[in-house]
Each structure stands twice: as structure tokens, then as C-alpha cells.
Amino acid sequence: MSSGMLDGLKIVRARKEHIDDIAVVENLSFRIPWSRQSLTAEFMHNDNAVYFCALIDGKAVGYAGMWQVCDEGHITNIAVHPEFRCIGIGSALVEALLKEAESRGLTALTLEVRKSNSRARSIYMKYGFEDGGMRKAYYSDNNEDAIIMWKRLKV
């Protein structure tokens, strides 16, 4: 896809009508994807969570989520459909989460990312996330380590 696709990009709060498209993105993006049922529960019933989706021509082509835990946020997932990667959608989703975290007065954001996922790690670093630790054998599909990344926010 070309970067001209971003002209039609909208980042909105995820709603029930986006779940089917998001489930497709989830299944194409993760080795152990969340089920449609888990996605529905998160989007509709988790009062401590906020989810955004990236829409192009009304179709959800990416999504991102964050849980609020006290005064911190934990980024749960960021995923973009393979046909729409590398054109800035992931960055737009990170920006939406950062803006939301700041509007809630959160002091920090954290996330886990596969040690091998250099593309995602470089996006997070671009936005000021730093390596803060490691979870050994965190991912059950291949026992890969997770890098814990943190970003302190201005309050």
C-alpha cells in the first residue's frame, strides 16, 4: 500500500461493529491471537481498557489497546493488517494511545514486545519508550523472551 492511503485514515475508539475486522487483523498478526470472544469482552466490558482502531474507507485495518492500572497504562496490543503495514498506521495508533494516556493523567506507559520484533521496538523507541527489563520465555509458542519497555509521561 502507498503512503497516500493515510489520507483516508481515521483513528477512532473501537466499537462493537469493528470487532470482526479487528479479529482478522489479530489472527494475521499474532501467533497466539486473542479470540473473538476475548476481543468482545475487552472492548465492551473492561472499564479499565481503551481500544482504538485505524479505519480506511470504514474498514478496521489496525487496532491498539491500553489497560489503565492505577496511574499507569499498559499497552496490551498494537496490530496492523499485513497489507497496510509500513505506511504509518502503527505510529498513528501509538500516538492515539499516548494522547489518551496524557488526557487521563497517567505517569507512565509500559508494554511487552518480542525480542525479535525489531520493527515494533523501533517504533516504540521513536516515541520515547526505553528497554526496562526482560521476561524470560514469556511467549508460550516458542519461549521467546519479551522486552519490557517503559515511557515516563509528563504530568
Pin down the residues of each PLM region.
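Conserved hydrophobic beta-strand within the GNAT/NAT acetyltransferase core sheet
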Residues: 75, 109-113
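Acetyl-CoA-dependent GNAT
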Residues: 4-5, 13-83, 87, 94-96, ...
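Short amphipathic helical patch at the helix-1/turn junction of helix-turn-helix
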Residues: 80, 114-115
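Short glycine/proline-centered loop/turn elements that form peptide/ligand docking sites
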Residues: 94, 116-120, 137-142
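Conserved catalytic-core motifs of GNAT/GCN5-like acyltransferases
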Residues: 112, 125, 130-146
